[in-house]
Every structure is written in C-alpha cells, then in structure tokens.
Amino acid sequence: MKILVTGFDPFGDDKINPAIEAVKRLPDEIAGAQIVKLEIPTKFNVSADVVKDAIAKEKPDYVLSIGQAGGRFELTPERVAINLDDGRIQDNAGYQPLNHTIHGDGENAYFTQLPIKAMAKAIREAGVPAAVSNTAGTYVCNHIFYQVQYMRDKMFPDIKAGFMHIPFLPEQVVTRPETPALSLDDDVLGITAAIRAIVSRDGKGDIETIEGKNH
C-alpha cells in the first residue's frame, strides 16, 4: 500500500506551518504502508496541479492532506469538502476568491473515503486530542480537499482521499493569548496514529461510534 501525505507551506503572517513540518518528520513506512511526502503551495490556482502530478506519478492508494487550523485544540479528520472558495485572506499568490465555485461540473460536496472516526479514536488512544470535524473551511485547505475528491470522481477512481487539520505550534501562539497549540512531536504522533487507522481499516469501512456534534 502507498499513501501520499501532503502538507502546506507557511501562509499569512506565519513563518512556519505545522502541516508540512509534521509531514516531513513522518517515517517512510507506517504499518507496512509506504509514505510519500509532498509539500504543496498555499495557492488556490496552483496546489491542485501539484497534487495531481504526484498522484499520476506515484499512483497512491490513499491521499491524506494535512493543513493548519489555528484556533483548534485537536487534530481533526474532516468529513466533507464543499465546492466553494471564499478566502478570508489572500493566498501566497495574492489571490483572494470571493464565493467562487471550484468546479462547475463538480458535486456541491464530496464526503471523504477515509475512516475518520477510526482515525480520531486512534489519535486519542495515542494520547493526542482528536475529534471529527464537519467543516474544512473555505480557504486553501478545503480547496485541496475538494480538488482531490474531484480528481477521484473524474480521473483517479481507485484512490481514497481525505483531509486532516492540525493546531498551531507553540511558537505560533506566543503573541496569540489563549490560543490552543500542540507540539510538533504530538502532531507527528497523531498523524502516524491516523495513518495506522487508515491501513487497519482498509477494505473494512469506518467504525460505528459517536462522533457527531450539535453545532
């Protein structure tokens, strides 16, 4: 089994992005699966092509994209990607879309094929906080989540794909009082646990357990 794991470069006012820093530190093999690591730019109009080229070259069984979610306390496997770009800030190319449909011939939303409940459970069992999330936002994280799902729908039907957000690093919250942070070691531990869950649930679907939210 081969798993492509992507992480974004820094964006906004931050000089570091825990996503790519954690991805770079993953082992090359987890639970018998080969791990292919890829840095992608935080740019709406470029990121999808970078991932598409990697999928075409590597032919992975799974794609797991990692992104930063400042303000969240836990690692959060994402349930659904929506067909909308609505940038709160400019991306790294200076582009800021407003209520922009990603693909006119795409679905309004795509649900992940990853076992997100099993992933959240495995992360918590590794001693790292985790919860299933029902919104990946409308910035480049949701964009690449949706784009990979669109690729699966139109071009790469055999892959399974999804997205997971991770919190700020401690050094990112020095001037952000009361903002949650998680160490890079815990990020790596949590992502590794999530990948182990992906491998162990391959061909079995997700586990049946409560991870829903009221709001």
Swiss-Prot record:
E.C. no: 3.4.19.3
Transmembrane segments: none
Source organism superkingdom: Bacteria
Catalytic activity: Release of an N-terminal pyroglutamyl group from a polypeptide, the second amino acid generally not being Pro
Protease as UniProt keyword: yes
Active site location: 78, 141, 165
InterPro entries tied to this protein: Peptidase_C15, Peptidase_C15-like, Peptidase_C15-like_sf, PGP-I_bact-type, PGPEP1_Cys_AS, PGPEP1_Glu_AS
Alphabetically ordered keywords of this record: Cytoplasm, Hydrolase, Protease, Thiol protease
GO biological process, one term: proteolysis
GO molecular function, a single term: pyroglutamyl-peptidase activity
Family: Belongs to the peptidase C15 family.
Quaternary structure and partners: Homotetramer.
Function of the protein: Removes 5-oxoproline from various penultimate amino acid residues except L-proline.
UniProt-recorded name of the protein: Pyrrolidone-carboxylate peptidase
Source organism (scientific name): Lacticaseibacillus paracasei (strain ATCC 334 / BCRC 17002 / CCUG 31169 / CIP 107868 / KCTC 3260 / NRRL B-441) (Lactobacillus paracasei)
